[in-house]
Amino acid sequence: MTTVISARVSGLRSTPSKLNLVADLIRGQDVSTAVMYLKFCRKKAAFLVGKVLKSAVANARANYDVDLDSLYVKEVLVGKSFTLRRVRPRARGRACRIRKRYGSVVIRLLKR
């Protein structure tokens, strides 16, 4: 039986489309390779996804006592979380709505 190690974070202050760009980099990679990709990627979303990946690795180390060299990223699920709505005043008494979108990330690791 294979154990799937996962970590989930909701409410990340980045849009799901930006998180998905970074998630595409690490899908199917070894954990050490994925950490290197995220370390040298110059995006804010890479920092956020990297924290979730480190949490999944910490879960593997603490709960399952797994060798970290044998882990790889099985799947990275990116979804949308809540949306904050703000109002921006415009000309002639009108107003526009500003949508500040938040994302959620689930990372699942598997042993090779």
Curated annotation (Swiss-Prot):
Keyword field: Ribonucleoprotein, Ribosomal protein, RNA-binding, rRNA-binding
Record's protein name: Large ribosomal subunit protein uL22
CDD domains xref list: Ribosomal_L22
Keyword Acyltransferase: no
Keyword rRNA-binding carried by entry: yes
Annotated GO biological process: translation
Role, per record: This protein binds specifically to 23S rRNA; its binding is stimulated by other ribosomal proteins, e.g. L4, L17, and L20. It is important during the early stages of 50S assembly. It makes multiple contacts with different domains of the 23S rRNA in the assembled 50S subunit and ribosome. The globular domain of the protein is located near the polypeptide exit tunnel on the outside of the subunit, while an extended beta-hairpin is found that lines the wall of the exit tunnel in the center of the 70S ribosome.
Subunit structure: Part of the 50S ribosomal subunit.
Record's GO cellular component terms: cytosolic large ribosomal subunit
Family named by the database record: Belongs to the universal ribosomal protein uL22 family.
Record-level Gene Ontology MF annotations: rRNA binding; structural constituent of ribosome
